[in-house]
Amino acid sequence: MKILALEPYFGGSHKAFLDGWSARSQHEWEMIGLPAYKWKWRMRHAAITMADDVAARIGEGATWDALFCSDMLNLAELLGLVPEAVRRLPAVVYFHENQLTYPAAAETDRDLHFAFTNLTTALAADSVWFNSKYH
Protein backbone atom coordinates (compact mmCIF):
# COMPACT_ATOMS: atom_id res chain seq x y z
CA MET A 1 0.00 0.00 0.00
CA LYS A 2 1.26 3.47 -0.88
CA ILE A 3 0.47 6.11 1.72
CA LEU A 4 0.71 9.86 1.23
CA ALA A 5 1.56 11.43 4.58
CA LEU A 6 1.11 15.16 5.05
CA GLU A 7 2.62 16.86 8.10
CA PRO A 8 2.52 20.65 8.29
CA TYR A 9 4.74 20.68 11.40
CA PHE A 10 7.44 18.18 10.45
CA GLY A 11 9.70 18.46 13.46
CA GLY A 12 10.03 17.34 17.05
CA SER A 13 7.57 14.68 18.19
CA HIS A 14 5.51 14.99 14.99
CA LYS A 15 8.54 14.04 12.88
CA ALA A 16 9.68 11.34 15.32
CA PHE A 17 6.25 9.71 15.18
CA LEU A 18 6.07 9.61 11.37
CA ASP A 19 9.71 8.63 10.90
CA GLY A 20 9.38 5.81 13.43
CA TRP A 21 6.14 4.45 12.05
CA SER A 22 7.15 4.64 8.39
CA ALA A 23 10.52 2.99 9.11
CA ARG A 24 8.79 0.00 10.71
CA SER A 25 5.84 -0.21 8.33
CA GLN A 26 5.42 -2.73 5.55
CA HIS A 27 3.82 0.01 3.45
CA GLU A 28 5.45 2.56 1.17
CA TRP A 29 5.26 6.08 2.60
CA GLU A 30 5.65 9.34 0.72
CA MET A 31 6.06 12.27 3.09
CA ILE A 32 5.29 15.88 2.42
CA GLY A 33 6.29 17.99 5.38
CA LEU A 34 6.84 21.62 6.23
CA PRO A 35 9.44 22.89 8.70
CA ALA A 36 8.40 22.95 12.35
CA TYR A 37 8.05 26.70 12.64
CA LYS A 38 5.19 28.92 13.85
CA TRP A 39 2.49 26.27 14.31
CA LYS A 40 -0.41 28.72 13.88
CA TRP A 41 0.91 29.82 10.51
CA ARG A 42 1.38 26.18 9.52
CA MET A 43 -2.25 25.39 10.36
CA ARG A 44 -3.43 28.37 8.32
CA HIS A 45 -1.48 27.88 5.10
CA ALA A 46 -0.51 24.20 4.95
CA ALA A 47 -3.53 23.08 2.91
CA ILE A 48 -2.75 25.59 0.17
CA THR A 49 0.98 24.89 0.12
CA MET A 50 0.59 21.12 0.29
CA ALA A 51 -2.17 21.00 -2.35
CA ASP A 52 0.24 22.57 -4.83
CA ASP A 53 2.93 20.03 -3.93
CA VAL A 54 0.49 17.11 -4.20
CA ALA A 55 -0.75 18.31 -7.62
CA ALA A 56 2.84 18.60 -8.86
CA ARG A 57 3.60 15.03 -7.74
CA ILE A 58 0.48 13.74 -9.46
CA GLY A 59 1.66 15.54 -12.59
CA GLU A 60 4.89 13.52 -12.30
CA GLY A 61 2.90 10.28 -12.12
CA ALA A 62 2.59 9.73 -8.36
CA THR A 63 -0.33 7.67 -7.07
CA TRP A 64 -1.33 6.60 -3.58
CA ASP A 65 -3.78 4.24 -1.89
CA ALA A 66 -4.45 6.27 1.25
CA LEU A 67 -3.96 9.72 2.73
CA PHE A 68 -2.63 10.23 6.25
CA CYS A 69 -2.33 13.61 7.97
CA SER A 70 -2.05 15.12 11.40
CA ASP A 71 -4.33 17.51 13.22
CA MET A 72 -2.11 20.38 12.04
CA LEU A 73 -3.64 20.17 8.55
CA ASN A 74 -7.04 21.55 7.62
CA LEU A 75 -8.09 18.43 5.73
CA ALA A 76 -11.37 19.94 4.51
CA GLU A 77 -9.48 22.80 2.84
CA LEU A 78 -6.92 20.44 1.36
CA LEU A 79 -9.59 18.18 -0.15
CA GLY A 80 -11.18 21.20 -1.79
CA LEU A 81 -7.88 22.11 -3.46
CA VAL A 82 -6.37 18.80 -4.62
CA PRO A 83 -7.11 16.80 -7.78
CA GLU A 84 -9.98 14.32 -7.67
CA ALA A 85 -7.58 11.37 -7.45
CA VAL A 86 -6.59 12.53 -3.97
CA ARG A 87 -10.12 13.45 -2.88
CA ARG A 88 -11.16 9.82 -3.50
CA LEU A 89 -8.44 8.37 -1.24
CA PRO A 90 -9.46 7.10 2.19
CA ALA A 91 -8.25 9.80 4.58
CA VAL A 92 -6.99 9.16 8.11
CA VAL A 93 -6.28 12.03 10.49
CA TYR A 94 -4.09 11.45 13.52
CA PHE A 95 -4.57 13.79 16.46
CA HIS A 96 -1.11 14.09 17.97
CA GLU A 97 -2.79 16.74 20.09
CA ASN A 98 -5.81 18.92 19.47
CA GLN A 99 -6.53 22.57 20.00
CA LEU A 100 -9.76 22.06 21.94
CA THR A 101 -8.15 20.19 24.85
CA TYR A 102 -4.56 21.40 24.55
CA PRO A 103 -3.71 23.34 27.71
CA ALA A 104 -3.80 27.11 27.18
CA ALA A 105 -1.83 29.53 29.37
CA ALA A 106 -5.18 31.07 30.34
CA GLU A 107 -8.63 30.20 29.09
CA THR A 108 -8.89 33.69 27.62
CA ASP A 109 -5.83 32.82 25.46
CA ARG A 110 -7.56 29.90 23.76
CA ASP A 111 -8.07 30.55 20.05
CA LEU A 112 -11.19 28.60 19.17
CA HIS A 113 -10.55 29.09 15.45
CA PHE A 114 -7.87 26.39 15.64
CA ALA A 115 -10.19 24.07 17.58
CA PHE A 116 -12.77 24.58 14.83
CA THR A 117 -10.11 23.70 12.23
CA ASN A 118 -9.52 20.45 14.12
CA LEU A 119 -13.26 19.76 14.10
CA THR A 120 -13.63 20.31 10.35
CA THR A 121 -10.59 18.11 9.76
CA ALA A 122 -12.17 15.31 11.78
CA LEU A 123 -15.44 15.68 9.86
CA ALA A 124 -13.62 15.52 6.51
CA ALA A 125 -11.69 12.34 7.41
CA ASP A 126 -12.81 8.77 6.86
CA SER A 127 -11.09 7.71 10.07
CA VAL A 128 -9.94 9.71 13.10
CA TRP A 129 -7.19 8.45 15.39
CA PHE A 130 -6.03 9.91 18.71
CA ASN A 131 -2.71 9.36 20.45
CA SER A 132 -4.33 9.02 23.89
CA LYS A 133 -7.64 8.98 25.71
CA TYR A 134 -6.90 12.53 26.85
CA HIS A 135 -6.86 13.92 23.33
Language-model features and meaning:
Residues M1-K38, R44-W64:
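N-terminal subdomain of nucleotide-sugar transferases
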Residues L4, A55-E77, Y94, S127-W129:
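Short N-terminal targeting/anchoring amphipathic segment
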Residues K15-A16, A76-G80, P103-A104:
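Short glycine-/acidic-enriched loop or helix-start segments at secondary-structure transitions
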Residues S25-Q26, W64, R88-L89, A125-D126:
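Short, well-ordered alpha-helix to beta-strand connector turns
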Residues V82-R88, T121-A124:
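Short, conserved loop/helix-junction motifs that constitute active-site signature segments
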Residues L89, V93-F116:
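Acceptor-binding helix/loop patch of EC 2.4 sugar-transfer enzymes
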Residues D111-V128:
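Membrane-proximal helix-turn-helix segments that form the acceptor-binding/catalytic region
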Residues Y134:
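Carbohydrate-associated surface elements
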